[in-house]
């Protein structure tokens, strides 16, 4: 909180949502590794972007997808076990990959997703404890995130980037049904959504 409050409109020239993601080198030892990172213009990424991240192989970078769903039949015991498992999986992935993607895409009638906040927070703090957090970027692919508040909380819990795929797919579905302007492309839908999120985050 600032006093007077920051004005995102009048002070737009000095505000930025750019997100450098990936391994961070030691700032006390100048080297090319300090700039060997990905720079995003803002933290909300498209479905196409997340697919690029999943298949990344440029300049020695790679990614690892962690499924944050578990079988419904396993109940509470399965929930707790899965939470521990994803923390260990993230720790192992941090040794070989630069981007870790937390995804609930496999959620369905037989598989429940662990809350993206719970899984993200658990992994973020586990990697801090194992001194691995600065080695990787944490990207969240979640159907939960829809509103500005959801995005802000995920960022606060340690996310470097977020793909709110369900919100984007819903908008595309409404367009296909003729409820939204049928001339809108997937890219236009994403740009409009991302701009709305940016305005909300700045506020």
Role assignments for model-derived ranges:
Residues 67-69, 102-103, 139-141, 165:
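A cross-family glycoside hydrolase active-site/sugar-binding cleft signature
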Residues 122-203:
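Phosphate/diphosphate-binding loops
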Residues 24-25, 35, 72-75, 107-111, ...:
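Flexible loop/turn segments at secondary-structure boundaries
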Residues 62-64, 96-99, 132-136, 160:
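Short, well-ordered coil/turn segments that N-cap beta-strands
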Residues 102-118:
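Glycine-rich, proline-tolerant flexible connector loops at the mouths of alpha/beta enzymes
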Residues 72-75, 88-99, 105-108, 125-132:
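Conserved helix-loop functional segments at active or binding sites
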Residues 1-91, 101:
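Extended, highly charged accessory segments
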Residues 66, 102-104, 123, 154:
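Conserved structural-core and active-site-/substrate-pathway-adjacent residues in large, well-folded domains
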């Amino acid at each position: 909180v600032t006093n007077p409050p920051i004005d995102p409109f009048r002070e737009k020239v000095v505000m930025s949502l750019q997100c450098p993601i990936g391994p961070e080198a030691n700032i006390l030892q100048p080297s090319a590794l300090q700039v060997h990172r990905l720079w995003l213009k803002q933290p909300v990424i498209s479905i196409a972007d997340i697919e690029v991240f999943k298949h990344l192989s440029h300049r020695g970078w790679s990614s690892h997808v962690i499924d944050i769903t578990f079988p419904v039949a396993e109940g509470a015991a399965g929930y707790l076990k899965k939470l521990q498992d994803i923390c260990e999986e993230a720790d192992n992935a941090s040794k070989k990959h630069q981007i870790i993607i937390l995804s609930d895409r496999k959620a369905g009638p037989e598989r429940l997703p662990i809350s993206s906040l719970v899984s993200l927070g658990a992994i973020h703090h586990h990697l801090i404890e194992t001194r691995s957090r600065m080695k990787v970027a944490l990207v969240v692919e979640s159907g939960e995130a829809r509103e500005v508040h959801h995005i802000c909380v995920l960022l606060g819990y340690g996310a470097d980037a977020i793909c709110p795929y369900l919100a984007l797919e819903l908008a595309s579905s409404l367009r296909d049904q003729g409820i939204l302007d049928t001339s809108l492309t997937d890219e236009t839908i994403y740009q409009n959504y991302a701009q709305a999120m940016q305005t909300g985050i700045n506020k």
